[in-house]
Design a protein with these regions (language model features):
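Sec-dependent N-terminal signal peptides
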Residues: 4-13
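C-terminal motif of bacterial Sec signal peptides marking the signal peptidase cleavage site
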Residues: 17-18
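Beta-strand-rich N-terminal accessory domains
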Residues: 22-99
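Residues that flank catalytic or metal-binding motifs in active/ligand-binding sites
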Residues: 40, 49, 79, 131-133, ...
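Short, solvent-exposed loop/turn and secondary-structure capping segments
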Residues: 54-58, 64-68, 94-96, 107, ...
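Short polybasic amphipathic segments
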Residues: 77-87, 92, 96-111, 135-137, ...
């Protein structure tokens, strides 16, 4: 069993929200795990008090990215964790459950295919459980010899408003080998620079210990455009690719996924804008 801790450090002003699933309230006991239709509209708020927010959904996806004092329920940036299990034909998966049907026509431009990573394979079985400030997502798939448990948490400490107001969120991933053989796998966390505001300063990916920072500078007239979002892990053997393939349309994401499917760990330095 392997366990990793992924920390999201949001050094910009955010906000927060929540919701998810439906299936006949009679069929589900009070405070039990959410499964099936019950998970469809869950959005559990993550972030420190007064720091802004994003949400972890019932499938494990991230959405409601509300930054720069702007609540935005449709802001679902392309960012995801993934696993590649070596030697398995279908062993590469985003660490989320299937995308809910309602989303495919529910967000701006979604009918035109602007669904970010929606077309990538995900785990077929999943459940969600919340015990504030913790949210827990469990994932399983018969094609992948690894079960996954994700625990996401807020920096909420009763009577300690200072530490409870830190702009951080914690994501702990636990992997369990369900086969009778040794398994080799590559875990990755991937994100486009959703901090970017075109035409307002410069956007780039900066280096951080065991991770990376999504940066956007401000301008003299619009200094409020400046913002930073750091993603890092406590694993000292982390390899970071700061620059995806530069191309048009969906080329960057497609090449990123090709690398994930091949278990390729590219290490590119920071420095390029965009």
């Amino acid at each position: 069993m392997t366990k990793y801790l992924l920390i999201c450090l949001v050094v910009c002003a955010l906000i927060f929200q929540g919701c998810w699933h439906h299936e006949s309230a009679v069929e589900r006991g009070y405070n039990e795990k959410y499964i099936g239709e019950y998970t469809r509209k869950i959005a559990f708020p993550i972030g420190g008090i007064g720091t802004g927010m994003f949400c972890i959904e019932g499938t494990g996806a991230l959405s409601n990215m509300s930054i720069r004092h702007r609540p935005n329920v449709f802001n679902e940036p392309t960012m995801f964790a993934a696993i590649h299990v070596k030697g398995y034909e279908y062993g590469t998966r985003i660490l989320e459950g299937p995308v809910p049907e309602w989303k495919k026509f529910g967000a701006p431009n979604s009918s035109r295919g602007d669904g970010g990573s929606w077309g990538m394979p995900r785990f077929k079985e999943y459940s969600f459980q919340s015990r504030f400030p913790f949210a827990e997502v469990e994932l399983a798939d018969q094609n992948v010899p690894i079960d996954v448990k994700l625990v996401a948490w807020n920096p909420f400490i009763p009577t300690d408003e200072d530490n409870s107001s830190l702009p951080v969120a914690g994501f702990e991933y636990e992997f369990h080998n369900t086969s009778n053989e040794e398994v080799q796998a590559v875990f990755s966390y991937n994100s486009m620079n959703f901090m970017q505001t075109p035409g307002r300063g410069k956007a780039y990916i900066d280096a951080a210990k065991n991770g990376f920072i999504l940066r956007q500078t401000g301008t003299e007239n619009e200094p409020f455009c400046q913002g930073d979002f750091m993603i890092y892990t406590d694993n000292p053997q982390t390899v970071v690719n700061h620059n995806w393939f530069r191309g048009g349309w969906f080329d960057p994401l497609s090449i990123c996924w090709d690398n994930l499917e091949e278990g390729r760990m590219e290490e590119n330095p920071a420095g390029l804008e965009g």
